[in-house]
Regions:
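S-adenosylmethionine
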Residues: 191-198, 202-314
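Conserved S-adenosyl-L-methionine
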Residues: 118-223
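Homeobox/homeodomain signature
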Residues: 102-103, 170, 308
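Generic preference for hydrophobic/aromatic residues in regular secondary structure cores
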Residues: 16-20, 173, 228-229, 234-235
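Class I S-adenosyl-L-methionine
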Residues: 2-166, 316-319
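Histidine (H) residue identity feature
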Residues: 12, 52, 170-171, 214, ...
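Intrinsically disordered, low-complexity boundary segments flanking structured domains
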Residues: 81-85, 187-189, 304-305
Length: 319
């Protein structure tokens, strides 16, 4: 384990690696790590999410019963190291970096996380923070989505860049993440939760089964199979609870639509005479008026707007 500890840099990462030695040899390190992520995510979710409580409590118990009492206590110590590591140095990919350093990634599935330094560069260069500030002033908050989030490094980097730009991401940014891999999606969920981000994490293929919402602001995700995970900040902060309530009231008022389509005004309807009042042209008028047949010009095909707005900022999509 001492050799493995040299693979990671953060002292709290090193402590987690050291704690692996407390488990017996019946399970390999990757299995222990994945079970640790599962029980930690379920415990965080069940603090406030009553909708998914029973399902996740069962998953928690099914996982934890595979371990001895002293090993369960080690899981609690490992989670404490995540909290301490993120609190002391929020500008890092705490879990993702450790996951790759210990070679837990799936090379067969092409699972290689973007280095955090690259994520920092992407978040700093590709984002127009003046525009985002203007949107926050106009609409109250912005939404940002990473459709292939991994352990959440790009969203974490974006949150830290928001703080540098004077944007309070706890109250003014809604983080939406999706990944096809359950474990790395839960790593992203823990990262966003520990940073106090108001977030929604969806487990699933973002191409074949992308996350969808009842509303246009991304506050009310459609969840039919328990794949949606809400961070504590999203459920507990008064401003986010108020925004969700307002979105539900808007849906109720508009019959299930988040935006009511404006009805045409009475004077906008063109006046069309009934067929009985339409007079055919005279022979003289037909002779004087040349008939020119020309093909109707083709209308340019407009790109359909995505559910999350444009993605001119690269992998991150804003809405």
């Amino acid at each position: 384990m001492a050799k493995d500890a040299r693979l990671v840099r953060d002292p709290h990462q090193k402590e987690i690696v050291r704690l692996f030695s407390a488990f017996d040899g019946s399970k390999n390190r990757r299995k222990i790590f994945e079970d640790f992520i599962t029980v930690s995510a379920c415990a965080v979710s069940n603090l406030l999410d009553t909708v998914h409580y029973e399902e996740r409590e069962k998953r928690y118990l099914d996982t934890i019963r595979q371990y001895k009492r002293n090993e369960i206590d080690v899981f609690a110590k490992m989670y404490g190291q995540i909290e301490l590591g993120v609190e002391e140095k929020p500008d890092q990919d705490f879990l993702g970096e450790m996951y790759m350093a210990l070679d837990f990634g799936s090379a067969a599935a092409g699972q290689f996380f973007t280095p955090y330094s690259v994520c920092q560069c992407m978040a700093a260069i590709n984002t127009d923070y003046d525009r985002l500030n203007a949107q926050i002033a106009d609409q109250g908050f912005i939404g940002v989505m990473d459709p292939a989030c991994g352990a959440g490094a790009l969203l974490v980097a974006f949150a830290n860049e928001c703080e540098k730009a004077g944007i309070n991401y706890h109250h003014s940014v809604l983080f939406v993440a999706q990944d096809v891999d359950y474990i790395v999606g839960m790593m992203c969920y823990l990262a966003l939760s520990c940073m106090g981000c108001a977030g929604i994490v969806c487990i699933g293929d973002s191409l074949l089964n992308p996350i969808t919402f009842h509303d246009s602001r991304g506050l009310l995700p459609i969840d039919t199979d328990g794949r949606i995970w809400y961070t504590p900040q999203f459920l507990m902060a008064p401003e986010w609870a108020g925004r969700q309530l307002a979105a539900r009231m808007d849906l109720f008022a508009h019959g299930g639509r988040s935006k009511r389509e404006p009805e045409p005004a009475a004077d906008e309807t063109p006046a069309i005479a009934p067929p009985s009042q339409i007079q055919p042209p005279t022979a003289a008028e037909e002779a004087e008026t040349p008939v020119v047949i020309s093909p109707e010009p083709e209308k340019p095909v407009e790109a359909e707007e995505t559910a999350y707005g444009d993605n001119e900022f690269g992998q991150l999509m804003f809405f």
